[in-house]
Amino acid sequence: MKTLITLTLAILLCCSVANAQEHKQEPKQAETPQSKLVQFQMALLRRGPKWSPDPSRERAQMRQRHVAHLRSMLESNKLMIAGAISGDPELIEVHIFRTKSAEEATAWLNEDPAVSAGFIVPELHPWWSEDVMKKMSGPPGRFTTAYLAFLTRGDKWTPEKTPATEDIQKGHMANIQRLAEMKKLVVAGPFGDDGKLRGIFVFKVNSIDEARQLAATDPAVQSGRLALQIHPWTVPEGILP
């Protein structure tokens, strides 16, 4: 039930963020979900100028230092979750920091040996969700694969609110509730910077095909208002709800 409430509130906030510029005269729409959710910072880490796919001693040593740094950040609870992305030519990892401050998250990112050396380059976004992820407590080296879906503006996306978009939104939320009740969709939340990226879904399912099939049932996706990019996301066991 808590997960269901979390997902519902997250989508309510997603609506308020998307319409913030067009509906500033309606502050309650933004304030109510924000009072229930927590702001974090999400870093999308892409290949940097020093990145290379070729194996080398330098790359192996950098990888070890990078992983050690991530574990230290997870243990200190500064980093809520971090994992490797598969199937994208540029995006390598996604990290979520337990802070609403972009400056603080940037400072933590710059402490990462792989970032400071130019192997990876972070792209930071404010992100909202209820605080449902658990502090890492399992032994090192145990991972699980979830499926991370980025919701982006689709070809039919518009900022205007109309009866048609309201109907789509109602169907969108009903579908999220259905997926949450199935215990397939475990985390959802909107980005707060009103850009092309609108939010994320995290699926705990057996395959990317199943994640795609579930995501495709969303009326906002079917209508073209939202589009999806889904990737395997390898994260430490025991953190996702």
Protein language model features and the residues they cover:
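Positively charged n-region of N-terminal signal peptides that target proteins for export
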Residues: 1-6, 21
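Bacterial N-terminal signal peptides
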Residues: 6-16
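Conserved, structured core segments of small domains
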Residues: 21-241
